[in-house]
Amino acid sequence: MSDHYHYPLDVSWSTEEITSVLHFLNQVELAYEAKVGAEELLKSYAAYKEIVRSKSQEKQIDREFQQASGYSTYQAVKKAREIEKGFFSLGR
């Protein structure tokens, strides 16, 4: 995948909300590119869900992010929930 891609952000979000969403997406990137702490990813996901409340919007963002980056927010959260603690990597 390209190192340069656009994040699926909503222009109606505040700067603080964008920062929270970006933090979560960065945690997902870490899960694929290196290692990420399950607790930290789940914490950032909880903050993300305060902004992206609807399941349909969450799925849309996941689709757009996966199309642009090759990384699935769904798979990262699923793995973090499975292990709960410690570090994991989804790198190929």
Curated annotation (Swiss-Prot):
Organism: Streptococcus equi subsp. equi (strain 4047)
Matching Pfam families: UPF0223
Name of the molecule in the record: UPF0223 protein SEQ_1039
InterPro entries in the cross-refs: BH2638-like_sf, UPF0223
The family this protein is said to belong to: Belongs to the UPF0223 family.
TM stretches of this protein: none
Highest taxon listed in the record's lineage: Bacteria
HAMAP family to which the protein is assigned, alphabetical: UPF0223
